């Protein structure tokens, strides 16, 4: 069974330091750790954060052949904790590799078909990525 996970990989900038995050990236890593054949689809930056994300996804067994290597920066989510320990997030989205979806680099659904397609989370609401992915997904 082939599973395609499409969506953001980003860097959570925590008070203790940066870590690779993003709901879809975490989903892909979890599925790969469970032994599934998983390919991740997203724009991944060639900056230091992007290279760190690629390394972690690869280490966990996530296929990256369908991911786009981009010169744009990695999306970040800066995490702030209040006095009760509740988190708030400030996202750097605009102009990042993470949301640079273009139909020209997405896999051709006429040639390749996954058994399962998972699309989440922020890419489903951030334009133009959400429209590009919706139009592509209905063909899968």
Q: Where are the model-predicted features located?
A:
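Substrate-binding N-lobe of the ribokinase-like
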Residues: 3, 15-77, 81-86, 94-98
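Generic enzyme active-site microenvironment
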Residues: 6
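Short, solvent-exposed loop/turn segments at secondary-structure junctions
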Residues: 12-13, 126
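General secondary-structure edge motif
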Residues: 11-12, 36-37, 120
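Catalytic metal-binding/acid-base residues of hydrolase active sites
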Residues: 10, 45, 123
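Ribokinase/PfkB-type carbohydrate-kinase core domain
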Residues: 1-3, 56-58, 64, 83-140
């Amino acid at each position: 069974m082939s599973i395609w996970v499409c969506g953001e990989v980003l860097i959570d900038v925590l008070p203790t330091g940066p870590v690779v995050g993003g709901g879809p990236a975490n989903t892909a890593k979890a599925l790969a750790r469970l032994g599934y054949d998983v390919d991740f689809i997203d724009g991944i930056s060639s900056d230091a954060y992007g290279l760190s994300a690629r390394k972690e996804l690869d280490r966990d067994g996530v296929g990256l052949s369908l991911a786009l290597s981009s010169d744009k920066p990695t999306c970040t989510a800066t995490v702030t904790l209040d006095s009760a320990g509740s988190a708030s997030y400030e996202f750097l989205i605009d102009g990042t590799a993470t949301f640079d979806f273009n139909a020209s680099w997405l896999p051709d659904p006429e040639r390749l078909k996954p058994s399962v397609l998972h699309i989440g989370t922020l890419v489903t609401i951030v334009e133009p990525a959400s429209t590009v992915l919706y139009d592509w997904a209905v063909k899968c």
